[in-house]
Amino acid sequence: MSKPPSDLPRRPPAAFAYEDEAAEPGDNGRQQQGRRRPESFSEDIVLTPDEEDPFINPDRDPSAVAVATPRKRRTSFGKIALAAFGILLSLGIGLWTDRLIRDLFSRADWLGYAALGVLAIGILAVLALVIREAAGMMRLAAVQTIKAEAEAAILETRPAKARAVVSRLTTLLAANPETSKGRATLKATEGEVIDPPHLIALAERELLAPLDRKARALIVNASKRVSIVTAVSPRAIVDLLYVLYESVRLIRAMAELYGGRPGTLGMFRLLRDVLAHLAVTGSIAVGDSLVQQVLGHGLASKLSARLGEGVINGLMTARIGIAAMDLCRPLAFRAVKRPGIGDFIGDLTPSMSPRGNNP
């Protein structure tokens, strides 16, 4: 079968020149103007670090609470003066006690011996108190030592240091029944994991993940109590005192949960570190960022002003709990997600959370 003849004349073959310059008319103008002369610019070039670049780290939460770290202990003139006057006061009390006992002996021997017995009981009580406070400070120091050793062990190529860290962590949390299953898992897999980062991550998931869930429950309960008391209290001073009470109680519970069990002096040190962290990060006051977190969820149109203040104080208590969690936790957050302030908004305002909208 042949094609039917066509009436159109055939076009002879031809060659066409393809020029890129013809397709870009703007280039001709630039060529006519000539090249730009070299220039110098006085503005400084600011490079954004990779960890702060939102395009490199799209999952980074810009409103996340900064990680709290213990303050470095420095010797100051105030501490030296306080120690000097403390020694003078102790010497004065000693001289007064000596003169008192001598006067009692001069009056009657049994009064002098009774005073000596009371003095011995007081000295023993003070020694017991000093031992208890020293033990609490040592436990807090042990928590920070384990955290520092874990960070150093992750950079090692051999698992010896990582296994030593896991062993110390297991000993620290041995008295906590929440870690019994994790300790059994670590003992069953002993010697199987040889990579230090994976070994530290396994210990964090098995030992600290159950404690993290309990710590989150402590923060939520304390924040709810603060919110309720703030909403119903008639005076602002009552709010302030109750927030302080709940904060101290929450910090102590957090330290005991992670094996710290601080004494009175250790508790003051923890409280000072938490308050210093919040003051540095601007979280101790009700700032614009905290208000935006609440108002951004529609609370301005759905809650009263007093109840809104309760939610804000509850979120401030949650910030204190997160800071205490950072300070008291024996390992830094790596294998387990660190809680943020946004994780507690749904608990304080269930009507604003997705599950609260479901029938």
UniProtKB/Swiss-Prot annotation:
Major location (coarse): membrane
Keyword Transmembrane helix included in the entry's annotation: yes
Annotated stretches, region: Disordered: 1-61
UniProt keyword list: Cell inner membrane, Cell membrane, Membrane, Transmembrane, Transmembrane helix
One Pfam family hit: DUF697
Places the protein is found: Cell inner membrane
Cellular component terms per the entry's GO annotation: plasma membrane
Transmembrane segments: 77-97, 111-131
Topology relative to the membrane: Multi-pass membrane protein
Family that this chain belongs to: Belongs to the UPF0283 family.
PANTHER family: UPF0283 MEMBRANE PROTEIN YCJF
Protein name stated in the entry: UPF0283 membrane protein RHE_CH02332
